[in-house]
From Swiss-Prot:
Keyword Membrane: yes
Domain of life: Bacteria
TM region(s), chain numbering: 10-30, 34-54
Subcellular location: Membrane
Keyword Ligase: no
Pfam family, one: Bactofilin
Family: Belongs to the bactofilin family.
Keyword list, A-Z: Membrane, Plasmid, Transmembrane, Transmembrane helix
Principal location: membrane
Protein name: Uncharacterized membrane protein YuaD
Length: 187
């Protein structure tokens, strides 16, 4: 399956626009020898665009496999159990259980509630967490509320954010030891 990136589509639009503008200028000034090259470049861009975008345009009924590895718990969803992922987890609903993302990001949005332990590289809290949180970076937003025990290296609490319980700043040496223990525990 061919890869497609929306940034290329935007870039191709500007290249095609530049070629079209150059084509009009050359036609108006009478430089017909360059006109041939500009038309050729414009056709190449159009064919290139159809090659990559046309696949999406004419493939009715085919569901394209997503490259995204983000786990999303939607607003009206309740989940009981543990979640383990290597990437990003976005929580809009409710989770009763533990969340483990070794090098990932956990984002608990406004209205999202987690009862359990969260282990992650970065935690963005705009909802509620009741339990334990161990992360490298913790950002508590305006609506964020954490009740329990927190271990972090970097902490930011915005106006309105709240942490109640035990708060521990972890040094690099302790963080490395914790990482080794987590890896040993998973083995």
């Amino acid at each position: 399956m061919r890869a497609y990136c929306p940034h290329y589509q935007f870039m191709l639009f500007w290249i095609a626009s530049l070629c079209w503008f150059s084509l009009i200028v050359l036609w108006g000034t009478g430089f017909y020898s360059l006109l041939f090259y500009i038309i050729s470049v414009l056709l190449i861009i159009i064919l290139y665009t159809l090659y990559f975008i046309g696949e999406n345009m004419f493939s009715k009924g085919k569901i394209k496999e997503s490259d995204s590895t983000t786990t999303i718990i939607s607003k009206n969803t309740s989940f009981v159990g543990d979640i383990s992922s290597g990437e990003k987890i976005i929580i809009h609903g409710k989770i009763n259980g533990n969340i483990n993302t070794n090098n990932g990001v956990v984002f608990i949005d406004k209205g999202g509630v987690v009862n359990g332990r969260v282990l992650c590289e970065k935690m963005i809290l705009n909802g509620e967490l009741y339990g334990e949180c161990c992360c490298s970076t913790l950002d508590v937003y305006e609506n964020g509320f954490l009740q329990g025990e927190v271990s972090y290296r970097f902490l930011e609490i915005r106006n309105g954010g709240c942490i109640t319980g035990i708060v521990n700043k972890v040094t690099d040496e302790v963080q490395n030891n914790v990482s080794e223990l987590v890896k040993a525990r998973e083995s």
